[in-house]
Swiss-Prot record:
Residues 364-383, 539-568 are annotated as: Disordered. Dioxygenase that catalyzes the first step of DNA base J (beta-d-glucosyl-HOMedU) biosynthesis by converting thymine to 5-hydroxymethyluracil (HOMedU). DNA base J is a hypermodified thymidine residue found in the genome of kinetoplastid parasites, which is localized primarily to repetitive DNA, namely the telomeres, and is implicated in the regulation of antigenic variation. Also specifically binds to base J-containing DNA (J-DNA). Its EC number is 1.14.11.6. It comes from Leishmania tarentolae. Its cofactor is Fe(2+). This is Thymine dioxygenase JBP1.
Length: 827
């Protein structure tokens, strides 16, 4: 009995109308798989949060990165941000760096498309092609970043500038490509494909956010980037972003960054061959006049795409002045203290900060079940039309019931005989090639269960050819030229289930071998660049499809407000020699904009990249400790807390640390003033906080003094008073009442922690310093007290008091710049 074709067509596309997202179990599985290869690093995993401009080097003196604050003019950042915001779109291509979820990311400029299903390689990105008229808006920011790069690392800049093909430069700079990220917390990765002999540059173009520091994972260093900040760095070191610091669930935030780099594959022989092919083709096209008339081949060096070697850094709070540009006046003196503090067996840190730099048995870290997902801001979204299909259990189970509709006996009554014949032939050809490859795999390993999909194989080409026919089958079933998103979803999942079942039933492959996930990935490839296989089709089919494509495009144009979709279709098949057609001259004088070279000279004038000079003079450090309000002996913390607090799981967790119990059983630290101590050429002096001396020291350390001053205005005034006693910088040592993982915690756990933490740390301060009611502050509260420039925050690892050290310049920012400039002039 013949099936009713109308009912069949209706039933084929009658899929569940529930939101097309994955189940929680599927999301969790995807997340776990992603973080195996690309883990997230939270703030707790680092030692230093670096806030100011500085030059960061590894243990052998090689530059990791140079960061410059507010180095971009406002107009340049604003112009680029306005254009590039739309370049960051949901993409599954970088989902492994976002816990298995598609982040907001995109590329602009030129790209090689090596390993991509896009056939036409080494050319403009679709974004630049589609926004060619507006593209010059990025030229100022690209010019400024390039000049900053040239001033900071001239040898690297020159190597990159000499290697990059002129055809793919962005506005004459050594950058070929931009990567734009929006609200994207990246997991640990290196930038594979960047030019080995150069550096990459990153700029924050826009945003309102806290946290999301650029973390150099192997060094424990976080660099806080805010709008208009620029960093030149070795992108072959593993790097990531720390958590966003949200005060409450649903807090609004935004962050737009741009990475500037040279994609090394654009200078390889295959790319030059593509450039030359396009150039020769353009000579026969009288309708198009190229901007560039020859291809100059350049030496590209060797890019091995391996992570840079890691030479660890010995860190202490005194490492910060060795790095910060605004503290270079005291860098050599700080180096003396740093070396003495990090020497084997040194107890200098305990003398200055009240505890060692690292404690192995401090307050325990949280379990993953207490934390929000690192990509938790990525709310579930419908799949993109450029994707494959939803893999939810409901969608899959429905598709299993409907896969029969792609059998020939059903299609016979629903589509043309010609299209059915094409379907049968393409399907048979693909299954034949899959069978051959599977037989070869079994010959090598009879126990094999998984099918290895080779992207460059004949089987892969046959799959895309089958997809082209399948797309026409879908349109034939619908009886229209354009499918709705939900119709595409329904068809492609049914298509994948049908093919997976065919592999199992006809080729006797294990069900897991040709999995739905594997087919979904390849369908995403097809929907992004399936036109690459058009050239392999028979001439009569090419003609029929071209006519059909023309009708579809015409229908799209009539129904859309802009030509963006037409542009995209044109980009996929664009084979012209259109390099540098987007370029133009920027008249900086007419706009009254500062020239990039002059601007770079100004913003980099305090940059120090050479070796630090040594000093033999005596370095004097003043350590200020709280006055002993009273002598407290044998304090039992449990007697000091209400029963409800003392019995809470949070209190028990904090009290579980052996280091905490050592603090509780130790003698009070400030019962008497210690004598001055000399370590080499480092002299350490001590004073109570109420009787500051009048002498000037190289460095002043305030050891838990502010916890004795509850009034914020008075505490800020005290910092200013102490800063006046040092010629180098000030170290503010205080308890951070928020735990190091605070912004990664679930909000219910945060609330439980907030209830007990102040009382817990007050107990420790009573024992350590005799402070009856310590004023313990959050990181934000502490930093708001600083009246000058806070250069960095150093975190004593495993500290039972959760101690942090803020490194503070004694001078306001304008005085810092003048002092640094004077030092550079003398140098």
């Amino acid at each position: 009995m013949e099936p009713d074709s109308k009912k069949v067509k209706l039933d084929i596309f009658n899929f569940p109308t529930t939101r097309e997202t994955r189940t929680p179990e599927e999301v969790a599985e995807s997340y776990a798989e992603a973080v195996k290869s690309h883990p997230f690093y939270d703030n707790v995993h680092s030692v230093v949060d670096f806030y100011d401009s500085g030059t960061i080097k590894d243990g052998r003196g090689q530059i990791i990165g140079v960061v410059l604050r507010e180095a971009l003019p406002k107009y340049a950042a604003s112009m680029a941000s306005e254009l590039l915001t739309s370049a960051a779109v949901r993409t599954s291509l970088r989902s492994m760096m976002f816990g298995g979820e598609p982040p907001l990311s995109g590329i602009a400029g030129y790209f090689d498309y090596r390993g991509s299903p896009v056939e036409l390689k080494s050319r403009k990105t679709s974004f630049t092609y589609e926004h060619e008229a507006a593209w010059p808006a990025v030229f100022p920011v690209v010019d400024y970043v390039s000049e900053i790069y040239r001033h900071v690392a001239p040898e690297r800049w020159k190597a990159q500038n000499d290697a990059i093909p002129d055809l793919v430069r962005i506005h004459g700079t050594p950058f070929s490509t931009l990567t734009i990220n929006s609200r994207f917390r990246t997991a640990s990765h290196t930038d594979v494909g960047d030019f080995d002999a150069g550096y990459s540059c990153i700029a924050c173009l826009d945003g309102q956010f806290k946290g999301l520091a650029l973390s150099f994972d192997d060094f424990g260093i976080n660099v806080l980037l805010q709008p208009r900040d620029v960093m030149i760095f070795d992108s072959h070191h593993f790097h990531s972003n720390t958590e966003v610091e949200l005060s409450f669930s649903g807090e609004d935030w935004k962050r737009l960054t741009c990475v500037f780099y040279y994609r090394a594959a654009l200078g390889e022989p295959a790319s030059y061959a593509e450039y030359q092919r396009r150039l020769e083709k353009s000579k026969t096209d009288t309708r198009f006049t190229p901007v560039v008339h020859h291809v100059r081949v350049k030496e590209n060096g060797t890019s091995v795409n391996r992570p840079s070697p890691v030479y660890p850094i010995s860190q202490s709070p005194f490492w910060v002045p060795m790095v910060a540009h605004c503290l270079q006046h005291c860098a050599s003196a700080a180096q003396c203290v740093h070396e003495a503090m990090t020497a084997d067996g040194s107890r200098l840190a305990e003398m200055m900060f009240g505890e060692s730099l690292s404690t192995s048995d401090g307050i325990p870290l949280r379990g993953e079940d207490e934390k929000v997902k690192a990509n938790g801001d990525s709310t579930p979204r419908p799949l993109s039309r450029l994707g494959g299909f939803s893999e939810t259990n409901l969608m899959v189970s429905t598709a299993v019931e409907k896969k029969k509709y792609l059998d020939s006996e059903f299609l016979l009554h629903c589509i043309s005989a010609q299209l059915l014949d094409m379907w049968k032939q393409a399907r048979a050809r693909w299954l034949e090639l899959v069978g051959k490859e599977w037989a070869h795999m079994l010959a090598l390993n009879p126990e094999r269960k998984d099918f290895l999909w080779k992207n460059q194989s004949e089987m892969n080409s046959a799959f895309f050819d089958l997809c082209e026919v399948g797309k026409q089958v879908m349109l034939g079933l619908l009886g229209k030229e354009v499918a709705l998103p939900k119709e595409e979803q329904a068809f492609w999942i049914m298509y994948a289930v049908h093919l997976s079942a065919a592999c199992a039933e006809e080729l006797h492959m294990p069900e897991v071998a040709m999995s739905l996930r594997k087919l979904n990935v390849k369908l995403k490839d097809f929907n992004f660049g399936g036109t690459r296989y058009f050239k392999d089709m028979p001439p009569e089919e090419k003609k029929r499809r071209m006519e059909r494509k023309q009708r579809i495009e015409e229908a799209r144009r009539h129904g859309m407000p802009s030509g963006s979709h037409e542009k995209r279709a044109n980009w996929l098949t664009n084979d012209s020699f259109d390099y540098q057609t987007e370029d133009c001259v920027i008249d900086y004088a007419q706009h009254k904009w500062v020239l990039p070279a002059l601007h770079a000279k100004e913003v980099t004038k305090t940059v120090r990249t050479g070796e630090l000079p040594t000093t033999e003079r005596v370095v004097r450090v003043l350590v200020v400790i709280p006055d002993p309000q009273s002598k407290l002996e044998n304090v039992d913390c449990k007697l000091e807390v209400p029963d409800m607090v003392g019995s809470s799981s949070e209190w028990e967790r904090l009290m579980s640390s052996p280091a905490v119990h050592r603090v509780l059983s130790a003698a009070q630290r400030n019962l008497q003033l210690p004598d001055s101590v000399t370590h080499g050429n480092v002299q350490t002096h001590f004073a109570f906080h109420s009787t500051l001396p009048t002498d000037i020291y190289d460095f002043v350390v305030l050891q838990h003094v502010l916890s004795r001053i509850p009034d914020d205005a008075q505490a800020s005034a005290y910092i200013r008073r102490a800063a006046a006693l040092c010629s180098g910088c000030l170290f503010v040592v205080e308890t951070d009442v928020q735990c190091r993982q605070y912004y990664t915690l679930k909000y219910s756990i945060r609330c439980s922690y907030d209830t007990v933490a102040p009382l817990f740390f007050q107990q420790l301060h009573r024992v350590c310093y005799g402070t009856k009611t310590a004023r313990v502050r959050t990181k934000g509260e502490l930093e708001s007290l600083i009246p000058t420039v806070c250069c960095a925050r150093y975190k004593l690892q495993g500290s039972p008091l959760n101690t942090t050290v803020h490194v503070v310049s004694p001078f306001p920012s304008c005085e810092v710049q003048n002092l640094s400039s004077a030092l550079c002039d003398r140098a």
